[in-house]
Amino acid sequence: MHWLRLIFGLILVFALFRWTADVLGSNRGEFGVIIGLLVVGTTIAAKIFLFNRSFKESFSDVGLTRPNALGVLIAVVICVLMLVSIFVFASVTDSSFSFYPSWYLLVPGLFFQAGIAEETLFRGYLFGFIRQKYSFWKAAGISAVPFILVHLIMFYSLPFAIAFASILLSVVLSFPLARLFELGGNTIWAPAILHFVVQGTVKVLVASGESAQTFPLFWITVCAVIPLLVFLLPEKKIISPG
């Protein structure tokens, strides 16, 4: 019965998430703050009404409490390494990059929409629930399935090669995002930072030059490989919230 409630809540919140983003046309986080707050609010409401949890319990359940510094630090280091790779790409391919017009106005919305909203739903609500019953790898694997399915929509908006690579990325990325969730003390902030950089970078940077068209696939590869460094940290270092 709990599984049916879990799936119902997931579908309900995600449907609202997608519908709101489509109606508002928030492809680059233009209305991301509003969408993020809406998703967080409805996810908490789902925990309250579907699982009979209090507001305080639900707030904690979906990972919105104060994070452990370790997880956030690791997420930041991984993101810095990923961003440095862009300079390497530019140097090797003789490409150049510019910022999307008014990019700085998009950053907060991208963080709320790609980072906070998605991680509250998929890591806080979904993975957090499943992790109570299964080992890390099994819980991460199960929770990866819906995360992958919702990204299939990319086949309608992206070239096949990039969409296919993006689906593979969602498979791989599910695991380091889940690990960062635990490293951060079962909170969404560390994976939200990584998720924000993964999605936000290609929405605020514009590549130009002969090799510009290869940058999306390069970035997908970087986002699939570098976050796996999180698994080099001994498992005993993972701190549960106190």
Task: Give names to the regions the model predicted.
Residues F164-I220:
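Functionally important transmembrane alpha-helices
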